[in-house]
A protein has these predicted regions:
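A short catalytic or substrate-binding loop motif that flags glycine-/basic-rich loops and adjacent residues
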Residues: 42-45
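A cross-kingdom marker for long, charged
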Residues: 247-309
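C-terminal motif of bacterial Sec signal peptides marking the signal peptidase cleavage site
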Residues: 23-24
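Structured, acidic catalytic/metal-binding patches in enzyme active sites
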Residues: 34-38, 48-246
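Bacterial N-terminal signal peptides that target proteins for export
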Residues: 2-15
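Signal peptide processing junction and immediate N-terminal pro/mature segment
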Residues: 28-34
Length: 309
């Protein structure tokens, strides 16, 4: 989800409460495309950047796994990412920011009840202490916020704010400056409906789970960032499994949305090239966007990339 409203890192529950058809022959896209655009395919799947082609597409599109934070390390991506972003006709993000009503969005983050009514005294003190120590915010001042969104404040503090915008929003700003068309895969209301399908108590459990991690907050943040920039989707899956908690959460926030994303990507204009930025947690797995697109008849190939150190 978009970082300002959820900041669910990798779309996982803890520090994230704030990611089989393959054409046997060459795709319909001429080989000249990859030569012209200056990239080569990766020997393995340790990459966040993927080419989507075939199945009637006149131009290739590109799928890029993002992480919704402002830490400068995740902005040190390969120049080919910038090149393909510039090449694409359309930038697609999870939610088109132009379609969000800020007042409505703010209301969606609030609940009628008070978080005090869901926490024991010990839980309240623990969460209040953590929030104040790491963000300077007292729980009392945000007690009417849905617990799911309290993680956004926690995540922003843990992952650092070197850059002005989170990664996906930075691409959005660049697209707007260059008058590139921007679209969204999902609607804001769809993501909020997913949040509201989790009970307040379940949301609180996700917040409290993150406080009980054996790693320090700094170690948690470093581990997540390092896993992300490694581009290793298998390691990403392992990290997700460490935190994903209840199967209900994974189904609602990852699997169901993966299917919706793949369906809508498949409906894109075949004459246009899209640069599609979605949370990295949506890429891997049997029901990840990559495999779902392959099942729809697209050729989805890993592009060789690296991060600058």
């Amino acid at each position: 989800m978009y970082q300002k409203f959820s900041k669910t890192i990798f779309n996982k529950p803890a520090w994230i409460c704030a990611v089989l058809f393959i054409a046997a022959c060459a795709s319909n896209i001429p080989k000249a495309w990859d030569k012209e655009l200056g990239y080569s395919y990766a020997d393995n799947e340790n990459t966040l950047l993927w080419e989507i082609s075939g199945n009637g597409l006149k131009k290739p599109s590109y799928l890029y796994g993002t992480i919704h934070i402002k830490n400068k390390k995740v902005f040190q991506y390969d120049t080919i990412v910038t090149h393909l972003f510039n090449y694409a006709d359309i930038y697609t993000m999870e939610i088109n920011m132009d379609e969000i009503n800020p007042i409505k969005a703010a209301k969606c983050m609030m609940m009628e009840d008070d978080i005090k009514n869901y926490l024991s005294e010990a839980e309240y003190m623990m969460l209040d202490s953590f929030l104040y120590a790491n963000t300077g915010t007292k729980l009392e001042t945000i007690r009417k916020q849905k617990p799911f969104f309290i993680t956004s404040l926690m995540a922003e503090s843990l992952f650092g704010g070197d850059m002005k915008f989170a990664l996906d929003l930075d691409f959005y700003m660049k697209a707007k400056m260059n008058k590139k068309e921007v679209t969204g895969i999902e609607k804001f209301e769809e993501q909020m409906a997913a949040v509201d399908s989790i009970t307040i108590r379940e949301q609180i459990e996700l917040v409290l789970e993150s406080l009980n991690d054996t790693l320090s907050p700094t170690e948690q943040a470093d581990k997540m960032i390092n896993t992300y920039i490694s581009g290793n989707l298998n390691d990403l899956m392992v990290l997700m499994n460490d935190y994903k908690g209840k199967e209900k959460f994974e189904r609602i926030f990852i699997i169901n949305r993966n299917h919706r994303m793949a369906d809508r990507i498949s409906e894109n204009n075949p004459a246009k090239s899209y640069f599609i930025a979605i949370g990295a947690a949506h890429l891997p797995g049997k029901e990840g966007v990559i495999e779902l697109l392959k099942k729809k008849g697209f050729s989805v190939k890993p592009i060789k990339t690296s991060f600058n150190k």
